[in-house]
Amino acid sequence: MQSAILGFGMSIPSLRIKTEEIANTWKQDANAMINGLGVTEKTVPDAGEDTFTLAFEAGRQAIEIADIQSSQVSAVFVGSESHPYAVKPTSGMVAAALECDPFCHCADLEFACKAGTAAIQIVDSMIRAKQISHGLAIGADCAQAKPGDALEYTAAAGAAAFIMGPATAKNALCRIDQTLSFTTDTPDFWRANGKAHPEHAGRFTGEPAYFHHVREATKGILEIGSIKPEEIDHVIFHMPNAKFPSRVAKEFGFTKEQMEHGFIVPTVGNTYSACSPLGLAHVLQQAKKDDRILLVSYGSGAGSDAFLMTMMKDGVKLAPDTRETTYVNYTEYQSLIAAH
């Protein structure tokens, strides 16, 4: 039995900081940073927002779109590298807050920026095995970066959630056709226990890390799916910046039109575990029945999860976010980040 996405949701903070503001603070060339990264601004979590609150809001919306009772959900997996507690599961908090079935499989997942897609794979497997009828997979993060580090320009906050169930369900929106993972031991990015900020290996994060893993996962999923790039309608690659996914897409022959709906990084930033899942959530609003979707995540350390999906009906528009976008200065930004 195949699984499908029945509903989806997302939560993105309304606060932003512009790339120019960060660059000016550190006396760097703002235009060079914008052109180099392809990111003009990023989300900033407010004082009352964290990985749990973002995950909860996205999950609540996903249940609403799926048009099911939260008590039907018997598995909740939350992928993140910024869980609020070192010991106290975000997944259990989310399951309780959403009033899911208390006989619920719950776990917090970590694999850098691909923990959210790992959650999707686990729920997909449980549904295929007929162990559960409905599960909730969430990717959520309030990403950290050392002040003055290159990561500060992109490390952002957000969450995406997916209610999954049998592909035979009347409310099935998008079927999961195939999935695979490609994993190695590649030390491109890490945060040691007890450390406040992650470290990274600079340019090493590119070719032997992101590009190698995303290429291999993409080649593998296209091969097992017996599908060519031109037969894909929508493609989402992990977006640590705008340049990396654009480059790998060009290598495979994907067009800007195939990427446009899920390419959110220029004005959102890299939301880590929520990054490619948020791209998918945007695509699920625009895609049409029978459209084919390719999703490839990347998590440092390192690995990529790849998915082929098929839309079973036209996409569903989420309610518009009516909050006003507010831009903060660097001092305000650092104060908010310190609160997390």
Predicted regions and their residues:
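Phosphate/pyrophosphate-binding loops at sites that engage ATP/ADP/AMP, CoA/4′-phosphopantetheine
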Residues: 58-74, 215-233, 252, 287
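Flexible, glycine-rich active-site loops centered on histidine and acidic residues
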Residues: 128-160
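Claisen-condensing/thiolase-fold acyl-transfer catalytic domains that form or cleave C-C bonds
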Residues: 52, 56, 82-83, 101, ...
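Short beta-strand segments
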Residues: 9, 79, 135-141, 164, ...
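Membrane helical hairpin/interfacial module
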Residues: 66, 70-92, 96, 102-104
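Condensing-enzyme catalytic core mediating Claisen C-C bond formation in acyl metabolism
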Residues: 1-48, 149-208, 212, 216-219, ...
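Buried hydrophobic positions in well-ordered alpha/beta secondary-structure cores of metabolic enzymes
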Residues: 5-7, 33, 62, 76, ...
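A structural motif shared across PLP-dependent enzymes of the aminotransferase-like
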Residues: 21-28, 53, 82-93
